[in-house]
Structures are given as structure tokens and as C-alpha cells.
């Protein structure tokens, strides 16, 4: 199935918070803070039809309170507004 966001929206695969620290300590779900990072799966366009400045597989940090979750083939994805994308993460 191919999902293409409409308008200034971005489809992300949510990056989950680690369940175990690097030192091997388990972190219960109640103590984990939600990590607002994701990998871009698909992007919409600006109202004038121009491409959003993101591409598939970009690692992004997002903010805001509005995100719609969907499930495709047992994988969870979220739609966020482009205005809520705060930064891209570049590995050095």
C-alpha cells in the first residue's frame, strides 16, 4: 500500500524510545519520555504544488501536539503537519 500525504503534511515512522539503557538497565514504560523523532516515509506539497524540503528516509525531530496515528501492515506511522517539523538529524 502506498500512502501519499495531502497538503503540507509528512508521514513518519515513529522512532521508539529505548527500553534498556546502554548500561543494561530496563526502563519501565511509565518512566519513558516520548521521543519526538521519526523517519520520513512520504511528504505532501505546499499549497502552490512545490515540494516540501524533506525527502524519504530523512531523520527528523518534530514538536506540536497534533499527530494522527495510522497502522499499515502491523507498523505504526504518524502524520504531522510540516510546520511541526523542527529539524533534520544529520549523522556525522
From Swiss-Prot:
Disulfide pairings: none
Cellular component terms per the entry's GO annotation: cytoplasm
Quaternary assembly: Heptamer of 7 subunits arranged in a ring. Interacts with the chaperonin GroEL.
What PROSITE patterns does this protein's entry cite?
A: CHAPERONINS_CPN10
Q: What does this protein do?
A: Together with the chaperonin GroEL, plays an essential role in assisting protein folding. The GroEL-GroES system forms a nano-cage that allows encapsulation of the non-native substrate proteins and provides a physical environment optimized to promote and accelerate protein folding. GroES binds to the apical surface of the GroEL ring, thereby capping the opening of the GroEL channel.
Predominantly, its location class is cytoplasm
Quote the protein name from its UniProt record.
Co-chaperonin GroES
Q: Which GO terms describe its molecular function?
A: ATP binding; metal ion binding; protein folding chaperone; protein-folding chaperone binding; unfolded protein binding
> Pfam families of this UniProt entry?
Cpn10 (PF00166)
Native species: Methanosarcina mazei (strain ATCC BAA-159 / DSM 3647 / Goe1 / Go1 / JCM 11833 / OCM 88) (Methanosarcina frisia)
- Kindly state which keywords UniProt assigns to this record, in alphabetical order: Chaperone, Cytoplasm
Q: Which InterPro entries match?
A: Chaperonin_GroES, Chaperonin_GroES_sf, Chaprnonin_Cpn10_CS, GroES-like_sf
User: Record's family?
Assistant: Belongs to the GroES chaperonin family.
Compartments where located: Cytoplasm
List this protein's GO terms for biological process.
chaperone cofactor-dependent protein refolding
